[in-house]
Design a protein with these regions (language model features):
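Intrinsic-disorder/low-complexity, polar/charged segments enriched in Ser/Thr/Lys/Arg/Asp/Glu/Gln
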Residues: 1-5, 60-62
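Short amphipathic alpha-helical patches
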Residues: 2, 45-50, 73-77
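Alpha-helical protein-protein interaction elements
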Residues: 6-7, 21, 72, 77
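C-terminal structural segments of small proteins and small subunits
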Residues: 56-89
Length: 89
């Protein structure tokens, strides 16, 4: 299992568009991928579960991946988040 702590820096946090980009990306992987904020955990392949985390700007999340492509999954998610979900702010 691989994990990575990341800070959400985009203005609107994990809103619908950002969550949709996460789901699109994570569905390319076979690994089980989760996002954790505080004591709440969401399946990163479910837009509704991601939105229920209510992740705002400045929040720290923990991404975990478990499976044969876990390293690639964590890497690609980290890059997406570092690019602020390709949003112009």
């Amino acid at each position: 299992m691989k994990e990575k702590r990341l800070l959400i820096k985009n203005k609107l946090g994990l809103h619908a568009r950002a969550a949709a980009k996460i789901v699109t990306l994570t569905n390319k992987f076979t690994s089980n991928i989760e996002i954790k904020k505080g004591d709440k955990v969401a399946d990163a392949k479910s837009i509704m579960k991601i939105l229920m985390l209510a992740v705002s700007k400045g929040s720290e999340i923990l991404i975990t991946a478990n499976g044969k492509d876990e390293v690639s999954a964590i890497h690609d998610l980290e890059k997406l988040i570092e690019r602020n979900f390709d949003e112009n702010e």
